[in-house]
Amino acid sequence: MNIINKKVIVGMSGGVDSSVSALLLLQQGYTVEGLFMKNWEEDDHEQYCTVAKDLADAQAVCNQLGIILHKVNFAAEYWDNVFEYFLAEYQVGRTPNPDILCNKNIKFKVFLDFATQNLGADYIATGHYVIRKDINGKSRLLRGLDNQKDQSYFLYTIGYQQMARCFFPLGKLNKLRVREIAAKQGLVTASKKDSTGICFIGKRKLSDLLSRYISAKPGAIITVDNEYIGYHQGLMYYTLGQRKKLGIGGTKNGSQDPWYVVDKDINHNLLIIAQGHNHPRLMSNGLIASKLYWVDRTTLSTPLRCTVKTRYRQSDIGCLIKPIANNQLQVDFDYPVAAVTPGQSAVFYLAEQCIGGGTIEIRKPLGS
């Protein structure tokens, strides 16, 4: 590639990953500018949101690198295309993954369009730990080489045409090396802690955030044997596989194993629990997925053996996937999997290549 006069707009978050991404692209000879996105307005004060500090750090890094930093507010787009869906899913008792939707609709849609249409960018870049590789004329998504930081799970909705306009400078690095590069360059973000929490919303307590927008409906907690144990504060506050903050004290029911959420009966507003992390009620043989996205934008038409992740940081699970009616996908696991959660994403891989994924609609219980 002839990189002379190729402009790259780097999404600057104020963290070390985006800082080093900008540095590496500069060293490769690209014309680099930064862009800081503000995507949240509510509760915008110091206790919850670090946006002012993040902006200051992003500006400081850009000053150190001698590049322009653009600032843009995408709060309305985030609300319409991410947060409303996030709330709607919780209202029906599901557990969504807003980071995936944020990548799809904000970082690799709104940001990409703004950078190319308004700032004259040839490419955008982010600090994601993934690799883009061109195969048979299409850009493909590969796992980052650092297994502990690989973020391909969150990018399965991004198509090959968008991927072709994106750089991921950290894909072949591990986090320790990224911090070493930042420290050697004297970047102010070299030792800054990684951000946590919901995409762009920061460290707000999830239960507090939900309670501001959704009216909780308390109900009964029962065991898998229909024994009443206590009360829950609202099904939206709980997810499958959860063991902490169930509010049932030391109740053991004759066993020393801890309690886990194994199901939610939405129609009767019941939280169902059982003891043991491998209780049969918590396990699934497979799932049905919808809202399917394939990186190469070719719809799957025949069964395929591959691997799947049903949550981030999960080891790959061998599976057979096959298309079924209503643009859905049936996924049959090679072995039972715990806490498959409707609303989360099932993401598919062929070796190191992330080929796509979908939203988990139904989990298939053991014996089905």
Swiss-Prot record:
Keywords: ATP-binding, Cytoplasm, Disulfide bond, Nucleotide-binding, RNA-binding, Transferase, tRNA processing, tRNA-binding. GO terms for cellular component: cytoplasm. GO terms for molecular function: ATP binding; tRNA binding; tRNA-uridine 2-sulfurtransferase activity. It is found in: Cytoplasm. Disulfide bonds join 102-199. It is an enzyme of class 2 (transferase). GO terms for biological process: tRNA wobble position uridine thiolation. The record marks 128, 344 as: Interaction with tRNA. Residues 149-151, 311-312 are annotated as: Interaction with tRNA. It holds the Pfam family tRNA_Me_trans_M. The keyword Ligase does not apply. Belongs to the MnmA/TRMU family. HAMAP family: tRNA_thiouridyl_MnmA. PANTHER family: MITOCHONDRIAL TRNA-SPECIFIC 2-THIOURIDYLASE 1, TRNA 5-METHYLAMINOMETHYL-2-THIOURIDYLATE -METHYLTRANSFERASE. This is tRNA-specific 2-thiouridylase MnmA. The lineage of its organism: Bacteria, Pseudomonadati, Pseudomonadota, Gammaproteobacteria, Candidatus Palibaumannia.
